[in-house]
Every structure is written in C-alpha cells, then in structure tokens.
C-alpha cells in the first residue's frame, strides 16, 4: 500500500475512529492558538495585500475572513487567513518537523466548515486528521528538507488536503 493511499484511508475513516478526549482538547487549543495568531496577523501588510489581490472576489461566499468578518469563497478565505495566521510567526509549532501545522490546516478547515455547516466535532476531527498526516510527513522530511524549503508551505499542503478531504467527505 502506498503512503498516499494509507493517509487517504486514514482520513476516510476519521469519522469512525474513537478519539480520546485529551486529543480533542489539544485540537481545541490549537484552534484557539490559530485565532490568536490570525486576528492580529490579519491587520498586517501581507494579509492586507493578499486581501487586496482578491478584493474583487470578496463579498460572495460563506467563508469568513478575519479579523473583520467579510465573506468570500473557501479558497480565498483559506489563503487570506492562512497568510494572516503565519505572518507574525506566533502560530503553533511541531518542533520535530520544523513546521507550523495550524496555519495551513486550520485555515483550510475553517474555510470549508463555514461553507458546509459542519458540527464542532466534525471540525475538530478534520483538524486532527490534518495535523496527524502533515506532522508525520514533516517528521520524515526534516532536517534536510528545511535546508532549502519552508516546511509550513510544502508540508502544509498535505495537512490542508487531508483535513479538507475529511470535511468534504472525500476519499
């Protein structure tokens, strides 16, 4: 079985997996941390420039842009909020992978959760899936990968994809 298939099957089964309460607790803490980084980061130049680049697409959609609360498409909200959450470098870190998982994972999950009206538990399960997949990938890629690439950007894609696939019910 390929690694991609194994991670896909893991995400597909995430809704049925028994998750201990302390894992949900850590997913909630990661989400709070994400908001604490994203709201002030949204006031900084990188997020403002990203917003300006997409301003023609703002106003239609169900996904929220922080900190002001405008609505847009899930793609735009994930990009703008992801930029904001990583701007101040106060976002969470997975030290073993030299990686900030919250920025890509929670930005994608929140954008899709807004647009798809998912439960809080479904949201948290998506966050857990994204962290699990991306942290495992980051663990095997560093430190050599970090010599040339920013792990949050390269590995974050996998976490955001895993979490998004769970939110959307993809396999």
Question: Language-model features: where?
Answer:
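N-terminal core-entry segment
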Residues: 1-171
């Amino acid at each position: 079985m390929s690694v991609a298939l194994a991670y896909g099957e893991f995400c597909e089964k995430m809704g049925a997996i028994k998750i201990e309460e302390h894992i949900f607790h850590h997913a909630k803490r990661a989400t709070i941390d994400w908001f604490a980084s994203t709201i002030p980061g949204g006031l900084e130049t990188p997020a403002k420039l990203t917003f300006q680049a997409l301003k023609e697409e703002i106003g239609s959609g169900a996904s929220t842009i922080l900190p002001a609360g405008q609505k847009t498409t899930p793609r735009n909200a994930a990009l703008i909020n992801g930029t904001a959450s990583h701007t101040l470098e106060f976002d969470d870190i997975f030290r073993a992978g030299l990686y900030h998982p919250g920025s890509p994972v929670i930005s994608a999950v929140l954008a899709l959760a807004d647009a798809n009206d998912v439960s809080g538990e479904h949201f948290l399960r998506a966050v857990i899936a994204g962290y699990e997949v991306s942290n495992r990938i980051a663990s095997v890629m560093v430190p050599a990968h970090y010599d040339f690439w920013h792990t949050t950007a390269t590995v974050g894609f996998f976490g955001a994809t895993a979490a998004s696939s769970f939110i959307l019910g993809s396999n």
